């Protein structure tokens, strides 16, 4: 890697972004699992309310380009299918 100032700055920025993105992705996985567990436990009313929260988080992550918009749409669709069963 070059030792000029701009390369060092980009390296610092990339590291900060990676840390932030990893934490958001981890949070998304956790809340998605919680929603699935609610559905499997038969708590549909709670799951429906929680699904709205999950969808909002997925849309936010897609808007900030942490995940791809199609991935967010796919995850919301699959959770919705589970809810409707």
From Swiss-Prot:
Domain of life, per lineage: Bacteria
Instruction: Relate the protein's function as given in its record.
Output: Binds directly to 16S ribosomal RNA.
Q: Does the keyword DNA-binding apply?
A: no
Tell me which family the UniProt entry assigns to this protein. Belongs to the bacterial ribosomal protein bS20 family.
Q: Name one GO molecular function term.
A: structural constituent of ribosome
Q: GO biological process annotations for this chain's record?
A: translation
Record keywords, A-Z:
Ribonucleoprotein, Ribosomal protein, RNA-binding, rRNA-binding
Q: Check the record and name the NCBIfam families matching this protein.
A: S20
**PANTHER family tied to this protein:** 30S RIBOSOMAL PROTEIN S20, SMALL RIBOSOMAL SUBUNIT PROTEIN BS20C
SUPFAM superfamilies under this entry?
Ribosomal protein S20
- Is the Cell membrane keyword given for this protein? no
Among the Pfam families in the record, one is: Ribosomal_S20p
Q: GO CC annotation: what is one?
A: cytosol
Taken from the UniProt record, the cysteine pairs bridged by disulfide bonds within this chain are none
Protein name (record): Small ribosomal subunit protein bS20
Under the heading InterPro entries, the entry gives: Ribosomal_bS20, Ribosomal_bS20_sf
Q: Which Gene3D superfamilies match?
A: Ribosomal protein S20 (1.20.58.110)
> What would be the name of the gene that encodes this protein?
rpsT
């Amino acid at each position: 890697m070059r030792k000029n100032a701009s390369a060092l700055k980009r390296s610092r920025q990339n590291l900060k972004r990676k840390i932030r993105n990893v934490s958001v992705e981890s949070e998304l996985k956790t809340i998605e699992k919680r929603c699935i567990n609610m559905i499997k436990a038969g708590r549909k009313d709670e799951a429906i309310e929680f699904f709205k929260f999950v969808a909002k988080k997925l849309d936010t992550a897609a808007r900030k380009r942490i995940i791809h918009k199609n991935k967010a749409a796919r995850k919301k669709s699959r959770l919705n299918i589970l809810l409707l069963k």
